């Protein structure tokens, strides 16, 4: 009996022990309970480490591949060229790779914003632009799908923002900070900025254009004033009166912008942009409000295109009351409305109905015809085209209008295929260029994937003068 009671007591003791709370296991990094502030991880160049390579990557020799330093395993570091490694606690530049044989410049890292889902296209295009200028060493270090940004490394000092289609913004990347302490993000960010020299025209705090990025907006609104106050106290930002354009405005425009990009709350990318080689809007997004009278949201696409492609003087000169336009694929009238509101007479070509104020507007002539077969009786100032078809077919149509002298300016959309987007766009746009060159027509062509574009890009084409 005593033995039985002892056994029961031991059993009860074991049962009691199992009821005690246990420390939960997790695959993520443990949160430190120390009172001292954690030290952030910041990127700096790592020394090259030769490695054997069986098959060189396209565009690289075996010698190039062997000279590449090893990669590192952190999430942010995978986005960088393989010459970058984390260190503590010093802050060092990220873009100082060993110089490539035959090149006079070290690798420069660029941060590109883009529409989520187009990171590969954005990167491919940027690297292609660099290689088209001269034989260069260019890398696509890594891509986070649907992140809304990409990082490329090339041994060229400059990319041309105006010639990039998928990039919303072009920023030269200087520092990457990881493991930002939750209670004091300001100190490491200021330390990284202090590694840069000079004064900045303004500071932009930005986040990815994703659902996760939008959750950081409240944080940047709180953090921004603290950082700006600290930088002004150090004399790193222009005085408020200069920034507002009340004095020395011309000099202010020459200064670089400072960008602090937060992929998440624990990481920050520090970069600068050239005001003459970048987008002039926060996050590279030109936002538009929906007009109450517009018949469809497609009107926002053309409104953004006009703001992006034409400066104020060009808008005044090229979009004058009394001009004429043809809108192919016009229904329900979103693009036509942008012309009509400026007093431009529109011939709307579409088998579908026009809606709202455009249904019986005195400046709109609605023709129920096929946009690909329509030919104007006389030349017009503007051709608008937002028809859904293969980019090569639409490009051929646009070329016909310019070669035949039916229009002088055009804004049109090219719908993107599911695969080989950059290749398809290059073929379509180069087809237009080749035709106009053969005809001796001087022109201006700019293409961008706008904020209001989805699986498409928007193109501005303008005839200047015959050669």
Q: What are these model-predicted stretches?
A:
Residues 11-12, 26-28, 38-40:
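Intrinsically disordered, low-complexity, repeat-rich polar/charged segments
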Residues 2-6, 18-21, 34-35, 51-54, ...:
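SAM-dependent transferase fold signal centered on methyltransferase-like domains
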């Amino acid at each position: 009996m005593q033995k039985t009671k002892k056994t029961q007591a031991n059993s009860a003791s074991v049962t009691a022990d199992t009821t005690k709370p246990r420390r939960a296991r997790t695959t993520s990094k443990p949160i430190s309970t120390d009172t001292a502030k954690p030290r952030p991880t910041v990127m700096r160049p790592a020394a090259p480490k030769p490695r054997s390579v069986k098959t060189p990557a396209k565009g690289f020799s075996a010698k190039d591949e062997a000279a590449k330093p090893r990669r590192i395993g952190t999430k942010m570091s995978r986005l960088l060229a393989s010459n970058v490694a984390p260190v503590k606690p010093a802050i060092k530049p990220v873009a100082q790779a060993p110089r490539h044989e035959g090149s006079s410049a070290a690798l420069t890292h660029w941060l590109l914003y883009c529409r989520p889902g187009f990171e590969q296209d954005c990167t491919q295009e940027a690297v292609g632009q660099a290689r088209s200028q001269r034989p260069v060493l260019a890398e696509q270090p890594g891509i986070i799908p649907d992140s809304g940004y990409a990082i490329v490394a090339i041994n060229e000092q400059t990319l041309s923002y105006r010639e990039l289609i998928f990039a919303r913004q072009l920023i030269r990347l200087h520092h990457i900070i990881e493991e930002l302490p939750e209670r004091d993000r300001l100190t490491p960010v200021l330390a990284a900025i202090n590694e840069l020299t000079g004064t900045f025209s303004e500071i932009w705090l930005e986040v990815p254009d994703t659902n996760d990025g939008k959750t950081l907006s409240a944080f940047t609104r709180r953090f921004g004033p603290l950082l700006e106050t600290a930088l002004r106290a150090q004399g790193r930002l222009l005085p408020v009166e200069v920034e507002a354009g009340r004095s020395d405005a011309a000099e202010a425009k020459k200064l670089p912008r400072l960008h602090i990009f937060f992929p998440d709350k624990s990481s920050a990318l520090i970069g600068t942009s050239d005001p003459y080689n970048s987008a002039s809007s926060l996050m590279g997004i030109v936002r538009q409000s929906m007009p109450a009278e517009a018949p469809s949201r497609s009107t926002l696409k053309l409104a953004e295109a006009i703001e992006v492609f034409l400066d104020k003087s060009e808008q005044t000169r090229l979009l004058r009351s009394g001009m004429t336009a043809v809108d192919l694929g016009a229904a329900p009238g979103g693009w036509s409305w942008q012309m009509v509101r400026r007093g431009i007479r529109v011939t709307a070509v579409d088998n579908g109905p026009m809606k709202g104020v455009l249904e019986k507007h005195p400046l709109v002539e609605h023709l129920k015809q096929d946009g690909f077969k329509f030919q104007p009786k006389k030349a017009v100032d503007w051709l608008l085209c937002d028809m859904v078809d293969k980019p090569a077919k639409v490009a051929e149509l646009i070329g016909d209008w310019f070669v035949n002298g039916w229009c002088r300016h055009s804004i049109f959309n090219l719908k993107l295929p599911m695969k080989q987007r950059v290749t398809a766009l290059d073929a379509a746009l180069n087809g237009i260029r080749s035709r106009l060159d053969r005809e001796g027509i001087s022109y201006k062509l700019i293409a961008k994937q706008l904020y209001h574009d989805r699986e498409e890009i928007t193109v501005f084409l303008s005839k200047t003068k015959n050669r």
